[in-house]
Amino acid sequence: MNFRLSYLVTAFAVAALSVSAASAQKTGLKVFISVDMEGVAGVVNSDQVTMGGHDYNMARKWMTEEANAAILGALDAGATEIVVNDSHSTMRNLIAGDINPAARLITGSPKTLGMMQGIDETFDAVIFIGYHARAGSADGVLDHTYSGAAVHALKVNGRETGESELNALIAGHFNVPVVMIAGDATLCAQVKKSLGPDVVTTETKEAIGRYAAKTLVPSESQKLIRTNTAAALKKLSVFRPYKPSAPYVVEIDFLYSHQAENASLVPGVERVSARTVRYTQPDFINAFRMFRALVTLANA
C-alpha cells in the first residue's frame, strides 16, 4: 500500500515537472524577421538596390539599420530568440558585422524558402522590413512581385498576391502570424486589405512615382519600426496566421508569351492564355516551390 502511494506521488511529481518544463519552453518569444530592400526609407531607384550600383552601399546601410531597429523592437517586447533573413536579390546585402548580435543572420542564396528561409512552427511571430507593393501597383516605389523580369501578376486562389502575401502564406503553413510590416504607403494599404486590418504597418515613404517618393529620413523610419515592432509583439493574441483554404490554385501572368510557354512544359501546369499558366497544389510549400521553379524556367 505504501509502495503504491509512493509510486503515485513520484509519478505526479514527474508529470508536474514535465508540464513546468514545457511551460518554461513556451515562455520565450521567438521572432522571425524577413528583410527586403525596396521598401526601406530613402530608397527610390534601381541603382540603390543593385549590388555594384552607385548608391548601393548607402542603401544597404539603411537596410541594415532598419533590420536592427526591428531587432531592438523585438528585444523591447521580450524576445529571447531572433532570426533575421536577408531577403533581397542576392540575399547578401545586410552587413553581417553591423547586425545586432542578439539576432542570428541567414544570408546568401539559393535558399529553399527564399525570403522565408528559417521559418518553422517554433516561431511566435513574423516581421517584414523593407517590403514593397506588388507588381502593377499604380503608386508603388520599385513595385514588382518576386521577379521583375518575369512576373506581371500573381494570384493565389483568385486573390492578388505580392511578396507580402506570398511570404505570409509560407508563415501561415507553419501557423505563424505576420504581425508588423514596414514599407511604402501603397504596400501598407495593400496588406491591410489582404492580411487583415489588425496587421501593424509602418509607412517608410509615400510614392510620387515608381522612382520617386516623399520619404522619412532613415533615423525617423528606424524609430517607428522599433516602436511598432514592440507594440505588435506585445499584443500577439490579436493576430492570426494567413491561411486561405487548400488546395492552392496558383495563376502566374508572365511578362512575355515565351515565358508561359516554357513554364507549361512542366507536368501539371496548364497554359490558360498566351502569357498565363495555372496549377494546383494541396500544400502551400509545394505550391511555392513550384512557383519558384516556374519563374526560374521562364527566365531561362
Which stretches of residues belong to each language-model region?
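C-terminal segment of classical bacterial N-terminal signal peptides
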Residues: V14-A22
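Mature N-terminal segment immediately following signal peptide/propeptide cleavage
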Residues: Q25-S46
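C-terminal accessory domains and tails appended to enzymatic cores
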Residues: P218-A300
